[in-house]
Every structure is written in structure tokens, then in C-alpha cells.
Amino acid sequence: MFVRSLFLALLLATIVAADIDFSTCARMDVPILKKAAQGLCITSCSMQNCGTGSCKKRSGRPTCVCYRCANGGGDIPLGALIKRG
């Protein structure tokens, strides 16, 4: 148990020290991953009941910005996705 806790603490310290960004738009500047980042942002906004979203630079950091939240975009139909899989 102690070893597992120590490992997790060291892993967390490494991630913080490396300044790794785990946001949905973190890889929006990589040409191949740009479309994937955009898709993840739209999905994230949809889960927040917004119509759409896009990756923007805010204060020099990639950020997912959601739009049309007042109108809502509904949820992703998880039931339909589960039935397909």
C-alpha cells in the first residue's frame, strides 16, 4: 500500500513538474491532432448542454470555448452509441 501511494505521489509530481496540459484542446496546434481536439471540444460542450464549441487560445493557453449554451445542444445519445457498439 505504501509503495502504491509513493508511486502515485511521484507520478503526480512528475506531471506537475512537466507542465503537461490534459485539456481537450491541448493538442490543437499539432496538424494531425487538430481535428481530434476540435471533435473532443464539441463533444465536451455537447455534454454541457451547449450547441457547439471550438478550440481558442485564451491567455496563451488552448481552451475549449462553448457556444449557444442558452439554446442548448442536448446530450450525446449514449444509449444509441451503446447499442451500436
UniProtKB/Swiss-Prot annotation:
Tissue: Expressed in the pharynx (at protein level). Detected in pharyngeal neurons and secretory cells.
Main localization (coarse): secreted
Signal peptide: 1-17
Pfam families associated with the record: Antimicrobial25 (PF16839)
UniProt-annotated location(s): Secreted
Keyword entries, A-Z: Antibiotic, Antimicrobial, Fungicide, Secreted, Signal
Keyword Isomerase: no
InterPro entries: Abf-1/2, Abf-1/2_sf
A GO CC term assigned to this protein in UniProt: extracellular region
Propeptide residue span(s): 82-85
A GO biological-process term: defense response to Gram-positive bacterium
Functional summary from the UniProt entry: Exhibits antimicrobial activity against the Gram-positive bacteria B.subtilis IFO 3134, K.varians MAFF 118076 and S.aureus ATCC 6538P, the Gram-negative bacteria A.tumefaciens MAFF 1001, B.bacteriovorus MAFF 106101 and K.pneumoniae MAFF 519002, and the yeasts C.krusei MAFF 114085, K.thermotolerans MAFF 113848 and T.delbrueckii MAFF 113811.
PANTHER family: ANTIBACTERIAL FACTOR-RELATED PEPTIDE 1-RELATED
The name this protein goes by in its record: Antibacterial factor-related peptide 2
Lineage: Eukaryota, Metazoa, Ecdysozoa, Nematoda, Chromadorea
